[in-house]
From Swiss-Prot:
Bifunctional enzyme that catalyzes the epimerization of the S- and R-forms of NAD(P)HX and the dehydration of the S-form of NAD(P)HX at the expense of ADP, which is converted to AMP. This allows the repair of both epimers of NAD(P)HX, a damaged form of NAD(P)H that is a result of enzymatic or heat-dependent hydration. This is Bifunctional NAD(P)H-hydrate repair enzyme Nnr. Signal peptide: none annotated. Residues 217-485 form the YjeF C-terminal domain. InterPro entries: Carbohydrate_kinase_pred_CS, CARKD, Nnr, Ribokinase-like, YjeF_N_dom, YjeF_N_dom_sf. ADP binds at residues 397-401, 417-426. Binds 1 potassium ion per subunit.
Length: 499
């Protein structure tokens, strides 16, 4: 299995959230690399060439384990010690010092002239999967020296990715290490698929399988929604339209609007009936004098001026949800989040990957005729079948939220609390998913992030307010999760294991 650098970073961060610290993963990775080096080459002497980041930390651990097996090891640190900001790498450098393993520091390219690179094996631990582009000095010169040694007969082993190779595209913008063997940590990175005459091995860093399947801080931190141009202007960070509300349900669309705003979008429009109070100054209202919303009411809004539309909160069972969704499917190019009564119209619409459906178990059963089993695996399989069949994203709400992608990938959200059974939290979720989708423009990613953020916000609200929280409280805690994604615990992770 080959994965992107973004996906690998997501998995690492989610592992840390589960309690598997970076030092633990680094120790396992480096020990695994050392075993591969010994098993493949049985070297007498090895030079481990390390950078100042996490890949260098893997190299420090590799050197220590090679030394413990009786291999003559030297470590070359390409960069200044004080430039190491990764705590686990810094810790493992100190361990090398205490183990008496020599570490030579290279501050500029001239320092490389005295280094003997012609060993039995050189381990490339300069740069990992998070770095791309042209190499800077003295790293570039170190790569050239490694390649000279390779041509002279030295075996070269790269940790995770050959330094200089783009981890995703496999392109080489400048120069790259000419490795004989690449030892991938956890999963092979996509970029190595383009390598020829290079052996691939994979070692386990101790990352649990569940870290790949859950939604967590890694989903949020690796998302593009964090990026804001200092010169950006109003509307550039997302514009959301909420379509909902009726004379019977006046609060639901307001809560969805609040969720979108708290997710960080710039502008939120609300198309609703005039019975809904226009009492939020942050929302731009488009109210029509009608009992319920109809497709022709879409003329009241500029669909070209929004990125994402939410259909359903408070819409009412008698609204023409089929007509509204059909019109949107034909005339709107952005993401469409369908919740609550909006789901009643799904059967009459050609759904595609622009759609994110957010049913609870009863709505899922009603709309898709799928009986949901009691186990998480049964529910996951049902979501997978429907999301693949429709070609859209489905977020099935529950104790553990199940998110299915158009191509059948399944993720689980394990945040949340029973206190969130209070009315309106689903409306907040629809708004948050829309807010995220307006910025990342990808339905599955938005659903994963939205579920994690809202569940975490509910946990924080309960921690502060106990059982008496409201949907508004949950919305108010959304920015706190965006600021600190680590604040909530993976409350329902034991439910996953139990199933």
């Amino acid at each position: 299995m080959f994965i992107t650098s973004k996906e690998m970073r997501r998995i690492e961060l989610n592992s840390r959230w589960l309690g598997f610290e970076e030092d633990f993963m680094m120790e396992n990775a480096g020990a695994g690399v050392a075993r591969v080096v010994i098993g493949e080459y049985s070297p007498n002497d090895v030079l481990v060439v390390c950078g100042t980041g996490g890949n260098g930390g893997d190299g420090f651990v590799t050197a220590r384990h090679l030394d413990s097996e009786g291999v003559d090891v030297d470590v070359l640190l390409v960069g200044r010690r004080e430039a190491i900001k990764n705590e686990a790498a810094e810790l493992n450098l100190r361990r090398l010092d205490r183990a008496g393993i020599p570490v030579q520091e290279v501050r500029d390219s001239e320092d490389l002239e005295s280094v003997d690179f012609e060993r039995d094996v050189v381990v490339d631990a300069l740069l990992g999967f998070g770095i791309r582009g042209r190499l800077r000095e003295p790293v570039r010169s170190a790569v050239l020296r490694i390649n000279e040694a390779s041509r002279a007969g030295t075996r070269v082993v790269s940790i995770d990715i050959p330094t200089g190779l783009d981890p995703d595209s496999g392109e080489t913008p400048d120069v790259a290490v000419e490795a004989d063997l690449v030892v991938s940590i956890h999963r092979h990175k996509r970029g190595v698929r383009k390598l020829r005459d290079v052996f691939l091995r994979r070692v386990n860093a101790g990352i649990p399988e569940i870290a790949e399947r859950i939604c967590g801080p890694g989903d949020l931190i690796t998302s593009d929604i964090w990026r804001r141009d200092p010169w950006s202007h109003k509307g550039q960070h997302g514009r959301v339209l909420i379509i909902g509300g009726s004379r019977k349900y006046v609060g639901a669309p307001q809560l969805a609007a609040r969720g979108a705003l708290r997710a960080g979008v710039d502008l939120v429009f609300l198309l609703t009936v005039d019975a809904v109070p226009k009492n939020d100054p942050n929302v731009i209202y488009r109210a029509v004098p009608a009992e319920r919303l109809e497709p022709e009411h879409l003329d009241e809004v500029d669909l070209e001026g929004v990125d994402t539309v939410v259909v359903g909160p408070g819409l009412g069972a008698d609204a023409d949800s089929v007509g509204i969704l059909r019109e949107l499917a034909e005339s709107f190019d952005g993401m469409i989040i369908v919740d609550a009564d909006g789901l009643r119209g799904i059967s009459g619409v050609n759904v595609d990957d622009r759609f994110v459906l957010t049913p609870h178990a009863g709505e899922f059963r009603r709309e898709f005729g799928e009986e949901l089993g009691r186990s998480l695996e049964d529910r996951s399989e049902a979501v997978r079948r429907v999301s693949e069949e429709l070609g859209c994203t489905i977020l099935l709400k529950g104790r553990v939220d199940v998110i299915g992608s158009p191509d059948g990938e399944i993720r689980w959200n394990v945040t949340g609390t029973p206190a969130m059974t209070v009315g309106g939290t689903g409306d907040v979720l629809a708004g948050v998913v829309a807010g995220v989708a307006a910025r990342c423009r990808e339905g599955f990613e938005a659903a994963c992030i939205g579920a994690f953020v809202v569940g975490s916000a509910g946990c924080l609200a309960e921690r502060r307010l106990s059982q008496g929280l409201t949907a508004e409280d949950v919305a108010e805690y959304v920015p706190k999760v965006l600021r600190n994604p680590w604040a909530a615990e993976p409350e329902a992770v034991t439910e996953v294991r139990r199933d």
